[in-house]
Amino acid sequence: MGRPSSGAVGQPKVRKGLWSPEEDEKLYNHIIRHGVGCWSSVPRLAALNRCGKSCRLRWINYLRPDLKRGCFSQQEEDHIVALHQILGNRWSQIASHLPGRTDNEIKNFWNSCIKKKLRQQGIDPATHKPMASADTATAAAALPDAEEEDRKPLCPAVDGSLVPKQPAVFDPFPLCVDYGAGFAEELGAANAAALYGQLCGGKEVADDDAGFGAADYSCVLDVSENLGYGESSSNSSNWNYGGEVGSVLDGEVPHWAKAEPAFAEMERQQQHSPAEQKLSLPCQEQSLLASFDFNLELEPYF
């Protein structure tokens, strides 16, 4: 029942472990007389209690007549380092370039001797590059922002020191100081004229030698005659000045230079007027201003 083991009754047991000098002599004499044949039949023909794989490795690595014995020379060591830099850990290909040396022998010599020598010289055995340069490359890759910050241009600060120059930021509303005071005054006058034109409902503004001329304010203060305001919380009197405002301002011209006496007169009249008349609407205040004499002279504004 089952498959019989190789160590069955009547069959010699396969030996493992170190080879004895007698076994080396039997294998060597058999290969010299009969040559290399089928390795699975060599143990039976050479009267060895070994497997075919063990006989093959023993012949290739230790018993071949062309194998070199002894330590590696300095020339062989340099050759191994140069080949390892190109081929890496391909030991069989490296051994093909070194007659008389096996791949196992070269691998053991690399791990036990050559690798330690390279590290003592400051060379990485895996990359064959100086360890200092490898550390420098790693540090440079880890700090790209610091190098980018160093490459930024510097500009002088207020105290005389150099600070990094800030990038230019787009300003949708640039200042007009670079264009001179005249440009700013013209721009202010143009904006005032445009704003007044919008208040007048799109009507054109008359422009004379002084800058502003007579204008029709009836479009701004056009109040219906039938418009009445309700009673306030403190007085029940009914105000109805809409028609009077339109008739008073018809043909009048404002004089901005003499506005201060007008305001003073308006305050004086309000102080002597009854208490129920002190609360006034914006259109009613304009009607008081329109009753004064305005001329067309304008004083320069700075």
Curated annotation (Swiss-Prot):
GO cellular component: nucleus
Record-annotated HTH myb-type domain positions: 11-63, 64-118
UniProt subcellular location: Nucleus
UniProt KW keywords: Activator, DNA-binding, Nucleus, Repeat, Transcription, Transcription regulation
DNA-binding region coordinates: 39-63, 91-114
Start and end residues of each stretch annotated as Disordered: 137-158
Superkingdom as given in the UniProt entry: Eukaryota
Alphabetized Pfam families for the sequence: Myb_DNA-binding
Any one Gene Ontology molecular-function term assigned to this protein's record: DNA binding
Main location per the UniProt record: nucleus
SUPFAM superfamilies for this protein: Homeodomain-like
Tissue-wise expression: Germinating seed and apical meristem of shoot and root.
Role according to the record: Possible transcription activator in response to an external signal. May be involved in the regulation of flavonoid biosynthesis.
PANTHER family: MYB DOMAIN PROTEIN 55, MYB-RELATED PROTEIN
Protein name: Myb-related protein Hv33
Natural source organism: Hordeum vulgare
Gene name per UniProt: MYB2
